[in-house]
From Swiss-Prot:
Its main location: mitochondrion. It is found in: Mitochondrion. Keywords: Lipoyl, Mitochondrion, Transit peptide. Residues 66-148 form the Lipoyl-binding domain. The glycine cleavage system catalyzes the degradation of glycine. The H protein (GCSH) shuttles the methylamine group of glycine from the P protein (GLDC) to the T protein (GCST). Has a pivotal role in the lipoylation of enzymes involved in cellular energetics such as the mitochondrial dihydrolipoyllysine-residue acetyltransferase component of pyruvate dehydrogenase complex (DLAT), and the mitochondrial dihydrolipoyllysine-residue succinyltransferase component of 2-oxoglutarate dehydrogenase complex (DLST). The lineage of its organism: Eukaryota, Metazoa, Chordata, Craniata, Vertebrata. Residues 1-48 form a transit peptide. NCBIfam families: gcvH, PRK01202.1. This is Glycine cleavage system H protein, mitochondrial. It comes from Oryctolagus cuniculus. The glycine cleavage system is composed of four proteins: P (GLDC), T (GCST), L (DLD) and H (GCSH). Interacts with GLDC. Its cofactor is (R)-lipoate. One of its GO terms (biological process) is glycine decarboxylation via glycine cleavage system.
Length: 173
């Protein structure tokens, strides 16, 4: 069926092309398609922003010079049900490892530390009404702040996901 459609399209394209330029030959397979050929789009780590981690369990992903910051799954599990988030104001300038807020749960409170230097450009307003998003979706909807990066080379000092997993195993032992 697909080959029939391709041949029909090719024939239509050739007839249109021939009408506008009769001297030009139409190749039998102008797009070099073979029967059964399928073009796929792959998504994977190479196409996605890489998540980096700190020893204090914050993570950051970057896109176009903007970092999105949150806490790791390990941290949210250790905290328990988050009931309150204290976040900085937009425009706050942070240096790497500066304290920028806190999360409170029924079990404990934990300070938040900036993984990189930069300026806060956005805070997750949804956490004011629903701080439990940190527990439900710590890597997606439960992000904390977005920030510009004043020194992107600091990313190199953070742990990859694999290194972070090894780090967690080492502190659990």
């Amino acid at each position: 069926m697909a080959l029939r459609v391709v041949r029909s399209l090719r024939a239509a394209a050739c007839s249109l092309f021939a009408a506008s330029a009769p001297a030009a030959p139409c190749s039998p397979l102008p797009w070099r398609l073979r029967a059964g050929a399928v073009r796929t789009l792959r998504t994977g780590p190479a196409l996605l922003s890489v998540r980096k981690f700190t020893e204090k369990h914050e993570w950051i992903t970057t896109e176009n010079g903007i970092g999105t910051v949150g806490i790791s799954n390990f941290a949210q599990e250790a905290l328990g049900d988050v009931v309150y988030c204290s976040l900085p104001e937009v425009g706050t300038k942070l240096k790497k490892q500066d304290e920028f807020g806190a999360l409170e749960s029924v079990k404990a409170a934990s300070e938040l530390y900036s993984p990189l230097s930069g300026e806060v450009t956005e805070i997750n307003e949804a956490l004011a009404e629903n701080p439990g998003l940190v527990n439900k979706s710590c890597y997606e909807d439960g992000w904390l702040i977005k920030m510009t990066l004043s020194n992107p080379s600091e990313l190199d000092e953070l742990m990859s996901e694999e290194a972070y997993e090894k780090y967690i195993k080492s502190i659990e032992e």
